[in-house]
Amino acid sequence: MTYIENVFVCMAAPLVVALLSLKRGHRAALVFCLAGMGACLLSAYLNTFFARLYQADAVNAATQIAPVVEEIMKLLPLLFFLAVFEPAFARFRLAAVIVAASFATFENICFLTQNGADQILFLLIRGFGTGAMHVVCGNVYGGALRPVWDSRPLRAACLFALLCVAIIYHATYNLLVSAGGTPQLIAYFVPLPTALCFRLLARKAGE
């Protein structure tokens, strides 16, 4: 049995200490790291709760429950940041990527502690695949929001639409991974090129 809250404490402790030693203007990145890991921790509890509530098996939980719960949990700290601080678009986009990357990092570490570290090739493939998938889901809030950033109604509508896109992408990834064999390999391969495409589009847009 893996006590993920203990893993969270071990990872969060040095970040909290670092927060205390930094000036206010330099703390944002660490705060979003903590938010991403906290979202992952809470998602694990919520996934378990809803899986038991709906009596879902492993495949249904991974493809129907986890994508919705995890993408909503990743978006919540971003919505708080947006509502309270009204950040510029570039800062919001950076926050989205940091939350997604720290979420994936915590998830990978929990997977590592639960399954061991003896299969390095599989861990690399899964680490880059799942990590890139979460980063891609964080990146969907990038270029699509820029044209409507100054309009609150359009921004809210786009945020909901992009959340749905992230959920569908996440669910498709989980479905392919659950299928095993060739579909699983495709799932592990696709997110990294997708993340690179996002980067190329951002560079083309001058971000």
Where are these predicted regions, by residue range?
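Hydrophobic alpha-helical segments at protein termini of multi-pass membrane proteins
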Residues: 1-207
